[in-house]
Amino acid sequence: MRIAIGCDHIVTDEKMAVSEFLKSKGYEVIDFGTYDHTRTHYPIFGKKVGEAVTSGQADLGVCICGTGVGINNAVNKVPGVRSALVRDMTTALYAKEQLNANVIGFGGKITGELLMCDIIEAFIHAEYKPSEENKKLIAKIEHVETHNAQQTDANFFTEFLEKWDRGEYHD
């Protein structure tokens, strides 16, 4: 399995630790940088990771910045990416099993290296569990990302909101 990884200058050391962990587990790591602490901008590396995943160069991606918010927003702008910003196992597994996430994002100054490694390994081994409901949710996400004309419809999310109101979704 090939895993693309990228970060900004704030978490280079954390990214290197994660990269070494993945290599020790036998994964091929495609490291898009950054490689030092020279100030840079996370959108560059989020985009590179996202493009590697959607092109098939990598099977999954890992993005890390200080809080995870910036790089995760950047990678999610790449059409075809479904990235989840996580800091716990439950969220990571939900993202992969229910939403077929193909990138996982972390705040390297929020989540410790060992926990990131444990979560990434679980994310890699988790499998998407398709259902009619999550297929519809993923389709809605894809319609938004492709600027589908339906998204200008004021009722675009009505079906899901009605199901929520009826108690069909549970936290």
From Swiss-Prot:
Pfam families: LacAB_rpiB. Belongs to the LacAB/RpiB family. SUPFAM superfamilies: Ribose/Galactose isomerase RpiB/AlsB. It comes from the Bacteria. It is an enzyme of class 5 (isomerase). It catalyses: aldehydo-D-galactose 6-phosphate = keto-D-tagatose 6-phosphate. Heteromultimeric protein consisting of LacA and LacB. InterPro entries: LacB (IPR004784), RpiB_LacA_LacB (IPR003500), RpiB_LacA_LacB_sf (IPR036569). This is Galactose-6-phosphate isomerase subunit LacB. One of its GO terms (biological process) is lactose catabolic process via tagatose-6-phosphate. Its EC number is 5.3.1.26. Keywords: Isomerase, Lactose metabolism. One of its GO terms (molecular function) is galactose-6-phosphate isomerase activity. Pathway: Carbohydrate metabolism; D-galactose 6-phosphate degradation; D-tagatose 6-phosphate from D-galactose 6-phosphate: step 1/1.
